[in-house]
C-alpha cells in the first residue's frame, strides 16, 4: 500500500513501477506540478479524493511481467480533477468496468487505447478542451495460435458526457465498441484535427459537427473516417 495522509502539494513527479502495490491513497494531495506514472499490475484501489490539478501527464497502467493487462481494480474515479496539463492515460487494467472524471474540463489528451472489452462506463461530463487527441479503443485480445478472433467491447452503450467539447486539437478515434448506441452531441466543437470511428456496429442517429473546422497538425492531415 502507498499512503500519504498529510501531503497537499507536490512540485515534482510521482513514479511507481511495482507489481506488489495493491492500494494507493493520497488523502489531501490537491496539486501535482509534475507527472504521475503508476504501472501496478496488482492494483485494487487508486484514490486521490481531492486532487484537482496535474501539471503534466497522468498515466495509470496495469501491465504485468508478461506484458499483458492485469490488476483487479474495477472502478476508477478521481472526483475533483479539473485539469491535466499533459495526457490522461488509463490502459491495460484487466478488470476495469467503470472510469469517471466528473469535473475534468481540460487536458492535453485522453489516451484510453487499451481498455477492457468489459468496460461499461466512461464518464467525462464536463470536458471542454483537449489540446491533443481523444483515443478510446477496446482491447483486441490475443487470439489463439493460428486463428484471428478479435475481441471487441459489446457492453458499453453510451459515453457519459463529452457534449460540452469545443476544442480537440488532435484527433478523435473511437474503435471496437460494437454495442455503442449513440455518439455524444458534438455540435459545440469548433476545432478538430480529424475523426475516426471504427467497428461501431450498432450506432444510430446522425453525426453532427455543424461548427467544426478541421485543422491540420504537424503530424496529421485533416481526415474524416467512418
Q: Predicted segment positions?
A:
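Concave beta-strand-loop units of leucine-rich repeat
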Residues: 1-96, 100-226
Amino acid at each position: 500500500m502507498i499512503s500519504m495522509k498529510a501531503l497537499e502539494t507536490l512540485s515534482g513527479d510521482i513514479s511507481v513501477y511495482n507489481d506488489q502495490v495493491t492500494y494507493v491513497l493520497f488523502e489531501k494531495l490537491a496539486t501535482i506540478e509534475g507527472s504521475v506514472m503508476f504501472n501496478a499490475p496488482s492494483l485494487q484501489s487508486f484514490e486521490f479524493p481531492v486532487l484537482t490539478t496535474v501539471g503534466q501527464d497522468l498515466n495509470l497502467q496495469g501491465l504485468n511481467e508478461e506484458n499483458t493487462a492485469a490488476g483487479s481494480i474495477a472502478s476508477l474515479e478521481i472526483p475533483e480533477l479539473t485539469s491535466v496539463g499533459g495526457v490522461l492515460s488509463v490502459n491495460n487494467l484487466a478488470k476495469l468496468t467503470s472510469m469517471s472524471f466528473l469535473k475534468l474540463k481540460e487536458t492535453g489528451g485522453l489516451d484510453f487505447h487499451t481498455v477492457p472489452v468489459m468496460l461499461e462506463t466512461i464518464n467525462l461530463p464536463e470536458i471542454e478542451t483537449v489540446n491533443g487527441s481523444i483515443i478510446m479503443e477496446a482491447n483486441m485480445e490475443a487470439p489463439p495460435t493460428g486463428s484471428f478472433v478479435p475481441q471487441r467491447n459489446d457492453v458499453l452503450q453510451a459515453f457519459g458526457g463529452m457534449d460540452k467539447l469545443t476544442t480537440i486539437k488532435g484527433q478523435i478515434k473511437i474503435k471496437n465498441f460494437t454495442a455503442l448506441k449513440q455518439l455524444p452531441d458534438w455540435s459545440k466543437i469548433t476545432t478538430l484535427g480529424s475523426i475516426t470511428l471504427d467497428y461501431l456496429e450498432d450506432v444510430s442517429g446522425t453525426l453532427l459537427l455543424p461548427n467544426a473546422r478541421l485543422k491540420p497538425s504537424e503530424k496529421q492531415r485533416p481526415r474524416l473516417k467512418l
